[in-house]
Structure formats: C-alpha cells, structure tokens
Amino acid sequence: MSKIKEIVLDTETTGLDPYPTDTNPIGHRVIEIGAVELLGHVPTGKTFHQYVNPERSVPKESTMIHGLTNEDLSDKPTFQMIADDFLTFINGGVLIIHNAEFDLKFLNCELKKANKDDLSNFDFIDTLKLARKKFPSRQNSLDALASRFGIDRSARKDFHGALVDTNILSKVYLELIGGSQPDFTLDNIQQKKTSINTENNYTGQRSKKLTKRLKEDEIKAHSDFIKSIGGEKKWNY
C-alpha cells in the first residue's frame, strides 16, 4: 500500500532576512535545520537534525529566541558541507512547514550559495495557511495551535529549536488535516477523492543525481491530496 512521504521541516536563523540590506550588508543565515519524516502522515522515526556554522555573527536578539551563540556554532559544519545530506533526506517528500515563505526563502538562499538547485520543484503545505482557513479569527502561531490541540510544548518553553518545533508541528499538522490516522494512505485518498540523525555526519558531494521515486498512480493520488487540503503545487514530476 503506497503512502505519501512528507517532511515536516523547520529552521532557526540569525535573523529575519537572508538578503543583504543597508543595515545588514551580509544577510542572515540558517543556523539549525530540523526535519521529521512521515509516511501516510505517521512519523517513521527518521529525522534530520543539524546545527550550522553561519559564517557570520549571531545577534544577541536572535540568541534570546533560540539560545544558540557564536561559540555554540563555531565548530559546526557550514551549510555547503551538509547541503547534500539535507537534500537526500527530503528527496521525494512533500514539505510541511509553518509559515513556509520564511523557511523556503532562507533555504533557497543557502542552496544558491552552495551552488545547489533550490526547492522550487517541491510541493509544500503551509500549516499556517491551513490553520488560518480552519481558524480564521484566532491566533495561529505554533504555540497557540499546540495549546488548542492539547499538544505538549514544554520542550520549547525556554527556547525555540528546529527539531523540537518539527516534532510539535508534525502533531499539529495531523490535527489540522483531521487527526492522526495510521491507515491514511494514498490508496485511501484515491478512494475518497480527496532518525536518520545526520548531525556531524555530512558527506560532501552527492554521488549521483536524485531520481523520481513515485509511480504514476501515486503521483495522481498525491496531487489529489495536495489539492484537497489547499497545499501548493511546486513539485516538477
């Protein structure tokens, strides 16, 4: 029975804009990536987690949010060093991101710096947009949604963390699409018409180009699902 591969994804950064500005001439950078794999909307136990040396200083106001300092990141690999491992992990998956525009903007900027293809060929689902459709007049931050659904968020009480946030978001996402259903597979969708922890384990260049993994019937069912919940088609099959 075929199941959709989804990657719940989050980043932490040194600031709000990866592009150079008058007040920030070198742009902000990604300093942490967390990702959790789902199959059929159920966590597989596979994760990607990596702290990243931003090759610039971390502002104090950013440290107050995620708790990461220049010293914490000084011995970590650069994004270019871990880019291939990251791309391998997310390959073939639909990206599930809260406020996707922010994370995709940063990741695409980092990938460009690393001379890699950006994420424009990936489908993605923005859980913030899903939440705003479901709760149009309410607060829809990750904290607010976790509280609304009774999901434990004590792990992010002091600081935000990419892997902590993806674990919370994976549970929030399942609630937003109708609750955790282990048998919610591609076959079900057709009928209804609707850890690898890689920290400090980067390998450099990918040995061969990534290949398409979905069959034609899986692609159609996957497309139906994306449409049914208001996801955005970006994946070039």
Question: Which ranges hold each PLM region?
Answer:
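Acidic two-metal-ion nuclease catalytic site recognized across multiple nuclease folds
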Residues: 1, 175-237
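Conserved non-catalytic scaffold segment of RNase H-like nuclease domains
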Residues: 1-122, 132-135, 144-159
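Alpha-helix initiation and N-capping motif
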Residues: 83, 139-142, 219-222
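Acidic, Mg2+-coordinating catalytic module of metal-dependent nucleases/exonucleases
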Residues: 94-97, 106, 110-111, 141-201
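Short, well-ordered coil↔helix boundary/capping segments
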Residues: 136, 160-163, 216
